């Protein structure tokens, strides 16, 4: 029996060589603009426009890497730390804004942040934080086992800090531990142990961070009182300048003792002397507790960290 022949499928017409697909350029332009705006909001979320947090994280790490490495830190380790500082600072900004998303709209200085202004959704912020956390984890896995353990503890410090200021008046000291945690990590990675000098440096950074973050909190003191955020600026009250001065002296003393432990000489001491001058200038800035001046004093701490590092590096060079 003959099978019934089916009609052949229709041939596709030949493509016209002059044919050009209609991509609707105006739609592509709109999509590109929307993507650009979104990326700009993400950049604002991780504070790319305000690198002060990167510097304040970087200088303690550089102090530790130079001392632990006797002035010659491993280049690969240095790159890992620099990348880790950027990633962890970015992640810290994201989780801080997520934790404060209901408080920031009620504070003058923070009400225009992407999460507070609802230009970035909470889910987007969490996704960005997870991505940054995965990158930080990968970087930590390049370190020795002991350094990895310290890195894990540092991650826990960074994640828990934003919620602490709701319950205690001393979150600035906790922030100092988080910002200085790269110090024991550096010694663990380079020497395989965490000696006494590492804890002296960490103590100095905790005190220094309490200094500059109290100045930062002085900017928002009135709003923080209204919305219920706790800080050392509120706890210290009218004694804020005196207590800041005491902590500045104690931070310099801890750095001096660390220098003795590392047998550092004149260049390092000169760096500390220059740092003391910046502390005096900061005291002058905050004399009237004017918010803009307090914010300038906070930013000025970058130069304190810089001159201490320059003195340290020159000491190993000469």
Predicted feature descriptions by range:
Residues 16-40, 93-120, 214-237, 284-293:
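Cytosolic, membrane-interface loops and tails of multi-pass inner-membrane proteins
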Residues 55-64, 114, 175-189, 235, ...:
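Small-residue-rich segments of transmembrane alpha-helices in multi-pass membrane proteins
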Residues 47-57:
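Membrane-interface helix starts
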Residues 78-85, 101-152, 226-266, 270, ...:
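Multi-pass membrane catalytic core of lipid/isoprenoid biosynthesis enzymes
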Residues 37-40, 253, 257-318:
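Extended hydrophobic alpha-helices typical of membrane-associated regions
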Residues 58-99, 109, 133-141, 148-160, ...:
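Membrane-embedded alpha-helical segments that form the functional core of polytopic membrane enzymes
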Residues 65-70, 163-164, 189, 316-318:
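Structural signal for the C-terminal ends of transmembrane alpha-helices
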Residues 43-44, 113-196, 200, 257, ...:
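Intramembrane alpha-helical segments
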């Amino acid at each position: 029996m003959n099978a019934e022949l089916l009609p052949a499928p229709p041939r596709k017409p030949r493509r016209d060589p002059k044919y050009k697909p209609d991509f609707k350029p105006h739609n592509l332009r709109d999509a590109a603009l929307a993507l650009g705006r979104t990326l700009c909001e993400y950049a604002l979320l991780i504070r790319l426009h305000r690198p002060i947090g990167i510097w304040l994280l970087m200088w303690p790490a550089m102090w530790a890497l130079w001392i632990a490495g006797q002035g010659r830190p491993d280049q690969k380790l240095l790159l890992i730390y620099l990348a880790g500082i950027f990633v962890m600072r970015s992640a810290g900004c994201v989780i801080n804004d997520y934790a404060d998303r209901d408080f920031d709209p009620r504070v003058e200085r923070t009400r225009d942040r992407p999460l507070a202004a609802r230009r970035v959704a909470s889910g987007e912020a969490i996704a960005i934080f997870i991505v940054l956390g995965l990158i930080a984890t990968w970087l930590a896995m390049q370190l020795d086992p002991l350094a990895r353990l310290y890195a894990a503890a540092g991650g826990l410090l960074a994640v828990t800090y934003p919620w602490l200021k709701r319950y205690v008046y001393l979150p600035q000291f906790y922030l100092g531990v988080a910002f200085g945690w790269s110090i024991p990590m550096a010694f663990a990675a380079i020497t395989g142990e965490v000696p006494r000098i590492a804890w002296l440096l960490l103590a100095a950074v905790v005190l220094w961070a309490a200094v500059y973050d109290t100045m930062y909190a002085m900017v928002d003191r009135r709003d923080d009182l209204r919305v219920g955020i706790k800080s050392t600026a509120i706890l210290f009250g009218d004694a804020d300048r005196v207590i800041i001065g005491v902590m500045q002296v104690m931070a310099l003393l801890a750095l001096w003792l660390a220098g003795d432990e590392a047998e550092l000489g004149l260049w390092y001491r000169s760096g500390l002397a220059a740092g003391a001058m910046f502390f005096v200038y900061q005291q002058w800035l905050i004399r009237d507790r004017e918010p803009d001046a307090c914010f300038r004093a906070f930013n000025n701490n970058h130069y304190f960290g810089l001159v201490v590092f320059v003195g340290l590096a020159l000491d190993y060079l000469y």
